[in-house]
Amino acid sequence: MDWGTELWDQFEVLERHTQWGLDLLDRYVKFVKERTEVEQAYAKQLRSLVKKYLPKRPAKDDPESKFSQQQSFVQILQEVNDFAGQRELVAENLSVRVCLELTKYSQEMKQERKMHFQEGRRAQQQLENGFKQLENSKRKFERDCREAEKAAQTAERLDQDINATKADVEKAKQQAHLRSHMAEESKNEYAAQLQRFNRDQAHFYFSQMPQIFDKLQDMDERRATRLGAGYGLLSEAELEVVPIIAKCLEGMKVAANAVDPKNDSHVLIELHKSGFARPGDVEFEDFSQPMNRAPSDSSLGTPSDGRPELRGPGRSRTKRWPFGKKNKPRPPPLSPLGGPVPSALPNGPPSPRSGRDPLAILSEISKSVKPRLASFRSLRGSRGTVVTEDFSHLPPEQQRKRLQQQLEERSRELQKEVDQREALKKMKDVYEKTPQMGDPASLEPQIAETLSNIERLKLEVQKYEAWLAEAESRVLSNRGDSLSRHARPPDPPASAPPDSSSNSASQDTKESSEEPPSEESQDTPIYTEFDEDFEEEPTSPIGHCVAIYHFEGSSEGTISMAEGEDLSLMEEDKGDGWTRVRRKEGGEGYVPTSYLRVTLN
């Protein structure tokens, strides 16, 4: 079935239908264009989302990147980013294959449709013109027939009239004959025009217009076929990216399955294991025994100058709780009259170690002086922490790992330089054997530079090996101390009832007479409590300073210095007016901050 046969009289219907088909094509192109914009906006938002949640720091500088949870999350973000790329690819394919192609095809269809309908309208106009000519010839024939009949009647009337002259009769007959001849010619013209119109009309309805309608049908069917193919491109663009999107989803699933809680726990241990030994048992302090508060009493273990005796390194104890914050030294205690203790300097800041009474000294120390281990500074993240080359600012375990990393890096660099030196030597030998390939002397600067780098890296490797050995020994020592303390059972407290103080005193006297006094028995519990305040691991200086004025350093915890003396800065002023320094010949202590000119590293 075709339009030329079945719809020969539906010219306007076909015109509306073909216009609707082209409008539908344009609507689909517009839909795909907006769909492309949606895909592009979706991909852009996905990329922005991924960029927002990706780690800002490089993986090598981000400790969190070592955890499988973080790695899986980053992998999921990367898969989402790849997914966004596939959405962009869908948008690009739709834009090129559908929007551009169908827009161009729609313009071609509009031109073809316009041409066909112009041809049909010309045929209609020609047929209408033929019909008008037929009508004109018909009216002329009708008019001529009436005129001929009228002339014949007039001639017949004059012929019968006896009063009419012979000349009038002849004239009337001639006029009737002329009119009859004109009517005959009009008849022949009308018949010819009618025959011509019928032929044109048959050609119009049976040949010309059916051909035009068939062309319109073919055009519309081609348009519909192309539109259906455009519908298919919409799904094909999606199907093309389905395998990649499936891989993205599979990658997300793999990332989800890659989360390893046990490994993350192990990584946390590797990152933050300090290597410190666990705290030992808290010693029992017996306050039931009478104590003499005189400064000269030797039972307190206080020297005659009023300074408490510091315990040696072999008797140091582990810190009780390494995670507590260190407080700044408190102001000096008040005198019995309520005022501050006089300073050793007339115009200087108050001394951090004032007073001569041992118990007052110990009370002041326990309130003002806190442990200053370098490793504990790193745990609390103090602003005064100084990053040293040997990583001594880190806990022992972390120091060992960082030193191991540095040693491996230096070893790789050393091997690279050695390989480069060997390659340069081989190239030099080739140049010497075949001078046309190059000048051997041109390689001397590179060889010399490589040798210099090798020597430098060897020294660095030796340096890091020594530091690593020291750090490993410290870690092993801490582990051994911790295990030995853990294995040793705690000492039972030697407490006595309040009403048996005399018996306890006599028993102590008896035991002391039977056993020789030892170094450990001479240390009373009150000194055991404060020995950790005096024991510090050696730390690296954070700067240097020069003494502007002379300072005697007669108070407890201070150190003397001469005007112009160079000192190492060990700890900055915490706001109390005192700074801890170290002398070149040894010895550390506090001096007034206003007496120094400080330069930080």
UniProtKB/Swiss-Prot annotation:
Compartments, record wording: Cytoplasm, Cytoskeleton; Cytoplasm, Cell cortex; Lysosome; Golgi apparatus
Region Interaction with CDC42, annotated ranges: 293-537
Outcome of swapping L468S: Impairs interaction with CDC42
GO biological process, one term: endocytosis
Region annotation Interaction with PDE6G: where it falls in the sequence: 293-601
Superkingdom: Eukaryota
Record note on quaternary structure: Interacts specifically with GTP-bound RHOQ. Interacts with DNM2 and PDE6G. Homodimerizes, the dimers can polymerize end-to-end to form filamentous structures. Interacts specifically with GTP-bound CDC42. Interacts with AKAP9, ARHGAP17, DAAM1, DIAPH1, DIAPH2, DNM1, FASLG/FASL, GAPVD1, LYN, microtubules, SRC, WAS/WASP and WASL/N-WASP. Interacts with the ligand binding domain of the thyroid receptor (TR) in the presence of thyroid hormone. May interact with CTNNB1 and HD/HTT.
Family from the record: Belongs to the FNBP1 family.
Protein's recorded name: Cdc42-interacting protein 4
Lineage: Eukaryota, Metazoa, Chordata, Craniata, Vertebrata
